[in-house]
């Protein structure tokens, strides 16, 4: 498996490098603009290592990936690793926040749907979860901004406030994006939770617990959810 993984990574790196190479355009000319002098473009190519043979550039690129040197962004002209580090302090808390929200929403919804299997409430919940899966994140995010930031003014529509002003304000800035990301995940998790609980409720030990006089609610909480 290790050998297979190694060759898979090598093959993937070759495909990525070749794909970047065949894209039309010259990075040096793009960075300097269309009015750049030829000698300036040549100097920048040398600085970026674009004047070297493709195989040598591939080896340099792979070595940089292994040691965490991702080069310089052609658009922002800054080291990529620094840009990733700056954005990681926002993206990682946002991902964790969205994961927590999706779990908090999905568990009770899935349990409630399983407890009311075959009833109107169950069909309604499953219908809403299907809508949650189908709604695009960006459209739902715009709807949240319009409702809670523009109309109700509960949140700011100005983007991330930063962690410098406190964790509470930072989390408040991430709330709407986290909800937009959490909705489809919560919908999927709720459906999975419902299906799993329905399977568990049909097991023999659950039937035995009910036959011994344990109420459905207690059987669900003590044995089903566990």
Give the positions of each predicted feature.
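Short amphipathic alpha-helical coupling elements at transmembrane boundaries
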Residues: 33, 43-46, 60, 64, ...
């Amino acid at each position: 498996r290790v050998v297979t993984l190694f060759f898979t990574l090598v093959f993937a790196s070759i495909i990525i490098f070749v794909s970047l190479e065949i894209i039309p355009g010259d990075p040096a000319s793009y960075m300097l603009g269309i009015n750049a002098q030829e000698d300036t473009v040549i100097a920048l190519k040398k600085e970026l290592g674009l004047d070297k043979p493709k195989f040598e550039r591939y080896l340099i690129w792979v070595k940089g990936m292994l040691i965490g040197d991702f080069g310089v962004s052609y658009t922002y002209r800054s080291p990529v690793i620094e840009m990733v580090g700056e954005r990681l302090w926002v993206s990682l808390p946002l991902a964790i926040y969205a994961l927590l929200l999706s779990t908090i929403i999905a568990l009770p919804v899935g349990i409630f749907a399983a407890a009311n299997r075959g009833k109107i409430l169950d069909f309604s919940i499953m219908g809403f979860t299907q809508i949650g899966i189908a709604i695009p994140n960006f459209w739902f995010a715009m709807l949240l901004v319009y409702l809670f930031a523009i109309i109700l003014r509960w949140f700011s529509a100005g983007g991330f406030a930063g962690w410098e002003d406190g964790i509470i304000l930072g989390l408040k800035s991430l709330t709407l994006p986290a909800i937009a990301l959490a909705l489809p995940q919560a919908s999927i998790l709720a459906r999975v939770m419902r299906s799993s609980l329905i399977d568990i409720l049909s097991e023999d030990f659950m039937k035995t617990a009910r036959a011994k006089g344990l109420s459905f609610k207690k059987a669900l909480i003590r044995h089903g959810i566990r």
